[in-house]
């Protein structure tokens, strides 16, 4: 049976850490689901981890719906949260339309959006419409052009206070959980203590209620990128390269396909089929 919002929130009540991973396709989602991951995020990180873009900005709602649907087909138990991509929730009307597509067409059980107090009318409206909303504070990738570069957020008194106020405002608006990205660990701990809803950290220290990692980072699929806050639990890039090289070599030396990979045919049938043909 699929996990629910209540299941995730009860994990905070019990003090049980929440593990969340990004997923973008049915096969990977099924593997993560079988491992017992309680919550999967179909992130707009799809853009720079799957689609070859340099950021999340080019990702469209059509992209998100398509990949969310794939993940929903692959994972039968995990709660599926889908990112609302750049500028799809600039107004109340746009937000409702985007959320409807992600849930009706994509099969998500919840959506995630970035931003603080300015987003509370959007969060409140979506919740009123029956859409569970996860917030996202700290470094918000959709604002990459505003930030200029990836950096830790909330290090000054004013910035830290603003993050705390934003977190409380999102909870008050009805968010069921909150991602804290690139936030100093002590500040993330203070926010976590003040909220009734779960906090999910990424580069926010060990004291959040849960953690989320981009799956390509966690699996070691990229040699060119290793964020400081990420830990590689596998190193799949060389394994995949070596497998591809072995396949190329096997084809080149005609050791693949072998007899066991091929289908047989009655020689008489083939001979009769070829009769009269040039």
UniProtKB/Swiss-Prot annotation:
Primary site of residence: cytoplasm
GO biological process, one term: pantothenate biosynthetic process
Main EC class the enzyme belongs to: transferase
Substrates-to-products reaction catalysed: 3-methyl-2-oxobutanoate + (6R)-5,10-methylene-5,6,7,8-tetrahydrofolate + H2O = 2-dehydropantoate + (6S)-5,6,7,8-tetrahydrofolate
Active site residues according to the UniProt entry: 181
Cross-referenced Pfam families: Pantoate_transf
InterPro entries (alphabetical): Pantoate_hydroxy_MeTrfase, Pyrv/PenolPyrv_kinase-like_dom, Pyrv_kinase-like_dom_sf
Residues annotated as binding Mg(2+): 44, 83, 114
Protein family: Belongs to the PanB family.
NCBIfam families named in the record: panB, PRK00311.1
Subunit structure: Homodecamer; pentamer of dimers.
Primary role: Catalyzes the reversible reaction in which hydroxymethyl group from 5,10-methylenetetrahydrofolate is transferred onto alpha-ketoisovalerate to form ketopantoate.
Protein name per its UniProtKB record: 3-methyl-2-oxobutanoate hydroxymethyltransferase
Organism annotation: Roseiflexus castenholzii (strain DSM 13941 / HLO8)
Upper classification of the organism: Bacteria, Bacillati, Chloroflexota, Chloroflexia, Chloroflexales
